[in-house]
Structure formats: structure tokens, C-alpha cells
Amino acid sequence: NFASEKLNSSYTVIKKNKFITLSFDDLNIKDSDYYYQINHFNHVWEKSNLFKSDYIEGYDDNLITNYSNSFNTLVDYKNFRITIPNKNLKFKISGNYSISVHDDYGNFLFERKFSILEEKTKINIEFFKSKNLKNYNSHQNLDITVNCSNCNNLTGSSSQLKLVIIKNNQWSNKIVLSEPDFFFDNKLIYKNISYRGGNEFYYFDNSSINSTNL
């Protein structure tokens, strides 16, 4: 189970300085030690080149000390819980992260991914019908406006600004945009982004179904 304070889903997003909790059960009732590590990723979930000290404050590879034994159950187990940030580890920056768990022999067990966000700007999104007849029933168009100060400093060949669009928290269908179509001092504009989204609710048949019986 992996959840933030207000969200419980397979992919979790939290605001910076908020808490996230990972819990899991161990059916092996022997005394086993488990540890967790934190890794940072870029905008397409490739491991970043940052040092640990660049994105976390404290220690990595921490022992999980919060656990409880089952009581009055058919199968005995231990429940382990990790809440971060904590006294041993805090996040310095926002971005994409994973928390991985391994045993005391260094064997990898599993990992869960999550993102930490900072609301530094406002984004406006408008949805339209696809203008391409071939995609009319399967795609939607998006216009996105990013409001920012000194937007000109965010664009160019060396820019690290990336706009990533995902649907229903599924990164497999992501769209990554590196440059806006138009940029001004206070806004970046991305036009006519075509996205498979389904238009099944666009059409409404309001014809009368009343008929005269003969």
C-alpha cells in the first residue's frame, strides 16, 4: 500500500514538505531487517545524474524500524511502515522519485514511484475537438498556457524546461514537449496538442423520439 495524506493510488503525487507512507506485509515471521533507498529521476523516469546530496538531506539506505506483528489472524505476518520525510531523510527539491526496499543481504524486493511538486506557476488548459477527420472520434486537442515571469529565460536550446502530458497517471502514453509554439515575457503557449482521449461524449442527439400512433 502506498499513499499520501490525501491520495491512495498506484502513482502518487504530493506537495513538497507533505508526507507519504509506504506499508507492506512480510509473511516470513523470522526476524528480518529491511532497508529503504531513495532515487531521483528526470522527466521521463530515467535515473538523473544528481548526487544523493543534491536531492535529499540526511541519510539514505535507512533501516525500517516501524513495524507491528499481526494479532489473532489465520496467518502470522509483520506489517512494516515508512513515512517520509522523517527525522533521517528530507527532500531538497521537487521531481520524480522512487522508494525501493531491500533485505539485509542487499536483495532488491520492490520499488514504488512518486512525484513531489511545487506550485510555482499557473497552467491553463483548453480542450477541443480534433480537427483531423481521421482522428475525430479518437483524439482531442489541447491548448496549454503556462504563466511565468521572465519566460524568455526558460526557452532556448539549453533550456531544461519540459512539459510532460500524461493521461490517467499512465506514463506509457506520455507526450513530452521541449519548446512552446509561442513565448512571451509572461507566458508560454503550446497549441494544438493532439492526444488520444476519446470523443464519445461530444455528440448529443436531441432529436425527438415522440411519434404518433396510427
Predicted feature descriptions by range:
Residues I116-H139:
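Low-complexity, Pro/Ser/Thr- and charge-rich linker/hinge segments at domain boundaries
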